[in-house]
């Protein structure tokens, strides 16, 4: 353990030293000394020295406006470098990779040792693997793209420096390169000046594909194949690629008026353009590699006399020409030019696959398997994973937008007001129209701009090549008519295929009603005929936690999934559960392996579909090696969950969870909704108001510009509490409920649940992680600096609650301290705290200065505003999750 961490610590201190030299060169010795003093005070304050803690507070309060920005940037940049070192550590032979034997191999060995599982059963489970990762542009990726590229390069330098055999001059060159990169980062503005547009967000997603996933996916499949051969003597079929990527960037219009039908059309074209660009590079390599002459009669017949001399090259050059023509056409379309489709335009994956696979089969048959299984195999697998669209997109829209559109239409037609009809009347109307052969939309109707936008979006879906749009997600879905309405709007747009439409259940009530809604839908003959035995349902994690608190929400999510699984099984429907998890605990984020094994039995039978959000995309897929490791973790967890499902739930455990849910929800809502002091306290004790100024994502932070906590999106709500280190949404109510059940004499039952039920142990583990990142003295400091004295008692009450919660969680888990079973995470948090604490203290000071100036009617000082943005980004890096 220590030896492993000494490698990480030495990398962190080396990067810190280089950053120090950069600061000295840029700003002079006195600023570096100031930063060093603050760092030492912070370290000593963390070790429990109260006098130094006091001195730390005074030093930061007394910084002049000119010193604010350099100090904030120094600690913020250091945390980015520490994250980079930690990311490298997770894949380094000296780091976790060394002590973490291959996860797939470990899972396969575990499965082979189960007497009830035959090798054939395991093979079948592998063949039915399905993993779809949905990349979302949540405004939580704070770091600018240009800095991410520099950090990827820093990572590459660390990798080369790890090589024992490099010559001195190479070592010196690498160190010089590191110094250049860190200096470039220091002299780059880390805060975006403008909000990214939805197209910028989509380009960020494509950059992740190009820089990491393009290489990572074939590498992961090689790894998987190797482990299967070694452990089961089984080779993966060439066409078997269990992983797909979908994106919400450019498709998610829920609450984001900037995502229009035109934007979606543009992003679809851009995505296809990027795919042709990446495949052209692959094909170029194959043109130069596949110079072989010997080929099967089938391949020779395919190329004819013209290509007989170099049949493989001939096919590759043909494919290259088609890709170039396709790219030129897409480029013209992106510029707004309307050109006729060229001959050979690539629109379907088969058109890419067939010539490549013909070469593959011929090479195998002619004894050149070693060549077939090289770059050619990687390209074939990319065709299966990415294909012509590169990444498919989901469309997401709020249910009320569809209801309003149909209301406007029925009023125009003079048949009543759809919006005011009962659910039964709505369903009768929708089913009648869905069965009707005549169109419903009148030709000369001029709808409102909002309705026009909904109809235009359906038009874009109908026109897009089949397979480029993955699903239509309806947020805030509450009734069967919400789902039928979308099917009707798509039918009216002339869609020629059955598009998966997924209701998203995201509040406590909606989760509790989800099974009733789906049962009603599955009882409609027309609907059963349409879906052809497949249904997708999305479970919302973030909004349910904001609505009811984390304990009640997670139990409602579990029960909704459990009921849906049983209903679909009974109806013979293959259910895909789509998990809308976030990066942070308050939004359902948990280490992937633990989270998947804690779901109800059978929940992964239809594969895993999960959102990967904002900043988590970079932590989990930022480098090809990390992509391999993340995909392997998911693979191991899905196989284990499907083949060794957790036992059916004990009735007594269910009763305890019901009780915990009611108590925790009442306490949570008692504070968040009913305590009149809560919203003013939240607004002053956190940077919630100021977060709106950060140009993070293309989507507004609020659903409605006025209003309390309920109108805030889940992300800024959690982001704000993470900044002041109280982490309130991720624990409020949970500990109090546990304490009440302990007082009722059920502690031993809770301990058994913690031991034997993955769902419950994961909940407690997530609470421990939150408590380890929370910090009560810092939360108290925010109160003292920013909150009206009349509200101090509320802050104290909340902090006391957290202290009590920590005690009860440790008692049930039988641990003496937090994170006892994950010492490396505890170590990582401690390492960061030394750098995050000064940013927190500084942030409270900056908020104080900024609000003071506003109160006095002064213009905000740009130095204060800029430094505030930097502390927000820095604390997010220190906490390793934002919203």
UniProtKB/Swiss-Prot annotation:
What family name appears in the similarity comment? Answer: Belongs to the PEPCase type 1 family.
* Cofactor(s), names only, from the UniProt record: Mg(2+)
InterPro entries in the cross-refs: PEP_COase, PEP_COase_bac/pln-type, PEP_COase_Lys_AS, PEPCASE_His_AS, Pyrv/PenolPyrv_kinase-like_dom
Q: What does this protein do?
A: Forms oxaloacetate, a four-carbon dicarboxylic acid source for the tricarboxylic acid cycle.
**Any one annotated GO CC term:** cytosol
Entry keyword annotation includes Lyase? yes
Any single GO molecular-function term of the entry would be: magnesium ion binding
Enumerate the catalysed reactions.
Answer: oxaloacetate + phosphate = phosphoenolpyruvate + hydrogencarbonate
Q: Which PROSITE patterns does its entry note?
A: PEPCASE_1, PEPCASE_2
Q: Give the record's keywords alphabetically.
A: Carbon dioxide fixation, Lyase, Magnesium
Catalytic residues at: 138, 546
The record's EC number reads 4.1.1.31
Name by which UniProt lists this protein: Phosphoenolpyruvate carboxylase
Coiled coil spans: none
- Protein's UniProt keywords contain Magnesium: yes
Listed under GO biological process in this entry are:
carbon fixation; oxaloacetate metabolic process; tricarboxylic acid cycle
Query: Which EC class is this protein assigned?
Result: lyase
One Pfam family in the UniProt entry: PEPcase
Q: Which organism is it from?
A: Shigella dysenteriae serotype 1 (strain Sd197)
